[in-house]
């Protein structure tokens, strides 16, 4: 199965900072393209105001990802961005169910199901995030939590055209990374329960130093990269080491 790397910028970088990133990334990519596997897919999920800038990159393999979308199709929903709008921009992937959206914005299963339906309606590939808290991990509840989170949306998700991102909450932005063995075990569990051809990636303090060990695992098909994707050279090195 092909590997994929998706950079999630969260609420970082202005438009001018995004332009600067793209210029520097393009230079790095052109200088190192021979070191990057030809079948590696990669994308960046910037803030909504910078989405269109990703398409200006000279690196034509660089795809656009969105960090979120509305559960509604169109209408009087102030501040929302629809799947149709994202499709029109050339967006390929959309992150749904990230733990920060679940915790801070209280997104529930029904809303996540509606977002998945909207994404699929407009041919966007959902990157559906699952993950357990430190308390759940230490209590040995990882399997129960992950299976439950996917079961909650499996009736609407087309697993053949989706990506499941395993992001243990205790490893997001903490500097702690699940060992490759732990990540492999959970990603393997997802494939076991929801189909061996389901694309499963890992997220949580991924960087250029640990990416190779992670993507070398049998059940890990790539990575959702947070802070390390904000630096053009570091993001480029992640691609090289994948």
From Swiss-Prot:
What name has this protein been given in UniProt?
A: Triosephosphate isomerase
Compartmental location: Cytoplasm
Q: What is its main location?
A: cytoplasm
Could you provide one GO biological process annotation from this protein's UniProt record? gluconeogenesis
Known Gene3D superfamilies for this protein? Aldolase class I
Q: Self-association or partners: how does it assemble?
A: Homodimer.
PROSITE patterns according to UniProt = TIM_1, TIM_2
Question: Organism source for this protein?
Answer: Mesomycoplasma hyopneumoniae
Q: Which family does it belong to?
A: Belongs to the triosephosphate isomerase family.
> Which pathway, metabolic or otherwise, does it act in?
Carbohydrate biosynthesis; gluconeogenesis; Carbohydrate degradation; glycolysis; D-glyceraldehyde 3-phosphate from glycerone phosphate: step 1/1
State the Pfam families in the record: TIM (PF00121)
């Amino acid at each position: 199965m092909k590997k994929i790397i998706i950079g999630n910028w969260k609420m970082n970088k202005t438009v001018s900072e995004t332009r600067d990133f793209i210029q520097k990334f393009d230079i790095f990519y052109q200088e190192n393209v021979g070191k990057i596997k030809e079948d590696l897919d990669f994308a960046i999920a910037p803030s909504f105001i910078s989405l269109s800038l990703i398409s200006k990159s000279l690196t034509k393999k660089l795809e656009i990802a969105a960090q979120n979308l509305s559960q509604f199709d169109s209408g009087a929903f102030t501040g929302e961005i629809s799947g149709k709008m994202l499709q029109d921009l050339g967006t390929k992937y959309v992150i749904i169910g990230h733990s920060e959206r679940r915790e801070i914005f209280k997104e529930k299963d029904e809303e996540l199901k509606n977002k998945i339906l909207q994404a699929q309606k407009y041919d966007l590939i959902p990157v559906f995030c699952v993950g357990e808290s430190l308390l759940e991990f230490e209590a040995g509840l990882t399997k129960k939590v992950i299976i439950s989170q996917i079961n909650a949306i499996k009736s609407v998700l087309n697993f053949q055209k989706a990506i499941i991102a395993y992001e243990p909450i205790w490893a997001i932005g903490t500097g702690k990374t699940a060992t490759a063995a732990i990540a492999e075990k959970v990603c393997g569990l997802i494939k076991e329960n929801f189909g061996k051809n389901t694309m499963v990636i890992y997220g949580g303090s991924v960087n250029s130093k640990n990416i190779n060990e992670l993507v070398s695992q049998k059940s890990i098909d790539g990575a959702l990269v947070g802070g390390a994707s904000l630096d053009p050279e570091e993001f480029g090195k992640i691609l090289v080491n994948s």
